[in-house]
Amino acid sequence: MKDKELLALLKKNGWTVARINGSHHVLQKNGKTTVVPIHGKDVPIGLLNTILKEAGLK
């Protein structure tokens, strides 16, 4: 999955961008925080699974 697709999926599920630090977007929802790196490439599967678990989507 591309990084921008992941970002769009999280935003669709209620996550908002709290801040951007370089190429890392920090998203928040209900006091939870997750970081999505935006490098223009596919997100590695291990990192993708971790972000989806943190977001409650897996």
Q: Where are the regions that the model predicts?
A:
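Arg/Lys-rich, often Gly-containing low-complexity segments of ribosomal proteins
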Residues: I20-H24
